[in-house]
Amino acid sequence: MNLMLMGLPGAGKGTQAEKIVDAYHIPHISTGDMFRAAMADQTDLGVKAKAFIDKGELVPDDVTNGIVEERLSQADTNVGYLLDGFPRTLDQADALAVITDKLNKPLDGVINIDVDPEILADRLSGRFICKTCGATYHKLYHPTQVEGTCDRCGGHVFFQREDDKPETVKNRLKVNIEMNTPLLDFYEKRNLLYTVDGNQEIDDVFAAVKKVLDTIKD
């Protein structure tokens, strides 16, 4: 099966990707891993990508698309693949369609893990850190045993990273929703989109994902 995974930050894509890869024995291809491998192997495209990344610039589409094509050309994707983090734009989605047709590895399905943005905001903005020892907690999922006291060192001073502050999280989600919506429409029009309710326990989400994948497989 040739698959793509979509979802907003905090939706649990990484966890579901691991479960899909374990159950269906297909390679997990994330954008970050692709770039790191291309740069480590010093391919022509990897060298080009590194030059942009080192300058703190976005890697242009032609380089990104080329790296994706190189990765999907590798033999381990002959049994299928799970794309994660690409495409990010409609232009990249068009390029991916051309690449996968050329390689005769077209997408069989796009799985969107749909979670209420309010729940995601709570998930992402609930993290706090002990200033003394750096132990990490979450107000909902991993609170301190005694309120206001670090389990590890007994410290009483905590802080939040800028990235985890509610306003930052809300802006990040807003940007991602604006970016994802056209892509979801793109794949829905091509009858490739399958949306799974991600507002459930991890195993329940995977059960729903598996049901979709078994349908695609058949």
UniProtKB/Swiss-Prot annotation:
Monomer. Its main location: cytoplasm. Pathway: Purine metabolism; AMP biosynthesis via salvage pathway; AMP from ADP: step 1/1. PROSITE patterns: ADENYLATE_KINASE. Keywords: ATP-binding, Cytoplasm, Kinase, Metal-binding, Nucleotide biosynthesis, Nucleotide-binding, Transferase, Zinc. Residues 30-59 are annotated as: NMP. InterPro entries: Adenyl_kin_sub (IPR006259), Adenylat/UMP-CMP_kin (IPR000850), Adenylat_kinase_CS (IPR033690), Adenylate_kinase_lid-dom (IPR007862), P-loop_NTPase (IPR027417). This is Adenylate kinase. The keyword Metal-binding applies. Residues 126-164 are annotated as: LID. Catalyzes the reversible transfer of the terminal phosphate group between ATP and AMP. Plays an important role in cellular energy homeostasis and in adenine nucleotide metabolism. Zn(2+) binds at residues 130, 133, 150, 153. GO terms for cellular component: cytoplasm. It catalyses: AMP + ATP = 2 ADP. Pfam families: ADK, ADK_lid. AMP binds at residues 31, 36, 57-59, 85-88, 92, 161, 172. Belongs to the adenylate kinase family. GO terms for biological process: AMP salvage. Consists of three domains, a large central CORE domain and two small peripheral domains, NMPbind and LID, which undergo movements during catalysis. The LID domain closes over the site of phosphoryl transfer upon ATP binding. Assembling and dissambling the active center during each catalytic cycle provides an effective means to prevent ATP hydrolysis. Some bacteria have evolved a zinc-coordinating structure that stabilizes the LID domain.
